[in-house]
């Protein structure tokens, strides 16, 4: 197998060239056409002693050699995104900015059949968290904000780089008819080529890109510790934050 990369201006692609051997050329052709159809997308998963990664691409060519003494076919796969992404259980890292402390214990006493006096758990909100990133190159994140009550004007910070992302809830109210209310979810994707911010409310999704400050920074993780914090003008304790990220490598 040959693995390399090639550049087109500032755009880098990775190319796989794989040679497959079998008993007869007919067997090879049929199997290769089944698993590597021309111009179709494929995902390659690679496992080594210390890495389990995947990479996506498309089949550039699938060329059986009918004149060779040893039957085979050469398959070329182009990967426009040249990075290997962590796969399996390590494919997605999740950092919660809150914890749920269990409060219910035996024996217990319920003093009322109508009032909700029993406490089963208590949510502890954290406004700062650390994401330790082990990848070879910077990568974007997906930020999830769940509201358990109203909140206004949310600011998210990378305390190391001083980057900030500001969500204007006054603009949100003008756009959707309400500010941020209980059960709302905001999903922010800072991944290159996929940047977006979406409000999910009562099963409907809204593009709220216009609610971001015009000078908003789109966060990326760099190798090592990345410290994020968030604030709100009001209702900060009504916000539950979660940040998810993948890990990318330049090689295996």
Model regions and ranges:
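A short, compositionally biased
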Residues: 36-41, 148-151
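Short amphipathic alpha-helices in soluble, non-transmembrane regions
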Residues: 28-35
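Hydrophobic residues positioned within well-ordered beta-strands of beta-sheet architectures
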Residues: 13-16, 55, 73-75, 141, ...
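N-terminal assembly/attachment segments of tailed bacteriophage virion structural proteins
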Residues: 16-26
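Short, solvent-exposed beta-strand/turn "edge" segments of beta-rich domains on protein surfaces
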Residues: 5-6, 64-70, 131-134
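Intrinsically disordered, low-complexity segments enriched in serine, threonine, and glycine
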Residues: 92-252
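Short beta-strand and beta-hairpin "edge-sheet" elements
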Residues: 38-89
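Single conserved hydrophobic/aromatic residue that forms the stacking wall/gate
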Residues: 1-15
